[in-house]
């Protein structure tokens, strides 16, 4: 019997997951196309996003999915507030630097969460378009107050992007209770799947407005 992987991800996979990988699929086969559509629909249902959101699967890591979200769904003239309390907030900062996006940062220690009043102060004193937040910071396991952040961002009429890698599928994230424009996650953490598939759940109108943003 294989030992259990006590890591954030990849996780130990179930026998049913392993058995599902025994089959070969042609990318243009009807069964594969239907399976892909079914998976996308199921992921959208996890955020109660039917008819409002689309799932964009990415053949790559969770970081690749986050980078795709940042690069394709923001504009060159966007101004972003990045909330940082660990390595993955820092990673979004690095992405914005490489992409040439204008941003400010609010960083606290890895064992602390961000103060909502301070976030509001930063929003009110800067001409922002987006706020980037990590739901569960993988490096420490700390949970950020995503519902409070989302309510504040919605009230300021800004766009919220969430890195939910270590939360998606395990912690509440419903579009019926909080407002967000895009969330990135992956197959190999709380969903207990195999590595290699990241995905972004994005509002229909946001993906329509992103036409022409992609670098490839």
Language-model region placement:
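A glycine-/small-polar-enriched, mobile loop at the entrance of the PLP active site in fold-type I
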Residues: 2-59, 63
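General beta-strand structural signal in soluble alpha/beta enzymes
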Residues: 5-7, 56-59, 105-106, 132-133, ...
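Conserved beta-loop-alpha segment that forms the PLP phosphate-binding cup at the N-terminus of a helix
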Residues: 53-81, 85, 89-93
């Amino acid at each position: 019997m294989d030992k259990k992987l006590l890591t954030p991800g990849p996780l130990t996979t179930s026998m049913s997951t392993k058995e599902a990988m025994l089959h070969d699929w042609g990318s243009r086969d009807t069964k594969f196309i239907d399976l892909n559509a079914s998976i996308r629909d199921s992921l959208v249902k996890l955020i109660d996003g039917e008819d409002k959101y689309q799932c964009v699967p990415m053949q790559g890591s969770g970081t690749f999915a986050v980078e795709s979200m940042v690069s394709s769904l923001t504009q060159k003239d966007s101004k972003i507030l990045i909330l940082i309390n660990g390595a993955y907030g820092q990673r979004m900062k690095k992405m914005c630097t490489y992409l040439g996006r204008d941003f400010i940062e609010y960083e606290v220690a890895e064992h602390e969460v961000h103060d909502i009043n301070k976030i509001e102060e930063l929003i009110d004193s800067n001409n922002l378009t987006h706020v980037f937040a990590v739901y569960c910071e993988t490096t420490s396991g700390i949970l950020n107050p995503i519902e409070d952040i989302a309510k504040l961002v919605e009230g300021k009429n800004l766009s919220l992007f969430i890195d939910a890698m270590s939360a998606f599928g395990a912690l509440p994230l419903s579009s019926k209770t909080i407002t967000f424009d895009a969330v990135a996650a992956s197959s190999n953490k709380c969903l207990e799947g195999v590595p290699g598939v990241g995905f972004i759940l994005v509002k229909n109108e946001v993906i329509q407005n992103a036409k022409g943003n992609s670098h490839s």
